[in-house]
Amino acid sequence: MRKASVSRKTKETDIKLEFNLDGTGNSDINTSVGFLDHMFELLAFHGNFDIKLKAKGDIHVDYHHLIEDLGIVLGKAIDKTLLDRNGIKRYGFASIPMDEALAQVSIDIGGREFLIYNVKFDGYIKDIDISLFEEFFRAVSNHGKIALHINVLYGKDLHHIIEAVFKAFAKALSDASRIYGQQLPSTKGVI
């Protein structure tokens, strides 16, 4: 089983994550923010990952520190579970509709971090500025060593847009991390 435990404690956040890449979709999530709990539950379910997450942050200031640090911790956990990346499929893609919204995620978990985030919508879900999800996925990409392309083609309801992004990310990561053979997925011979 490809599992990792990652903790991060700063003056702003305290996060503990247990992540099983080869899970069954189980989750036990408590970030103290209902919408974030919902997104991580979707990530676990649609990626077939097991996620146990306890997090708290200085949300009395705003949500930036908590959301970015959750991305850091998730990225580190993904990187740890991929081990030497031998035998993985490496590339994944998903296109997910959520009612009127359509999100597409393409992913390369071959060890090179890069983020393209084409989510051209502004606003708030409750009191969370949705622009913070770009910081979340940037942290996942950087700390997970993932090239991550997120495109929202259209949508109106901000909840549906972000939910479609999380579901597409889950499906693409699940696909890319699947054991596909025994070789390192690179003609260079290294990742």
Swiss-Prot record:
Transmembrane region(s): none
Protein's UniProt keywords contain Lyase: yes
GO molecular function, one term: imidazoleglycerol-phosphate dehydratase activity
Location in the cell: Cytoplasm
GO biological process, one term: L-histidine biosynthetic process
InterPro entries per record: IGPD_sf, ImidazoleglycerolP_deHydtase, ImidazoleglycerP_deHydtase_CS, Ribosomal_Su5_D2-typ_SF
Record's keyword terms, sorted: Amino-acid biosynthesis, Cytoplasm, Histidine biosynthesis, Lyase
Family: Belongs to the imidazoleglycerol-phosphate dehydratase family.
Protein name according to UniProt: Imidazoleglycerol-phosphate dehydratase
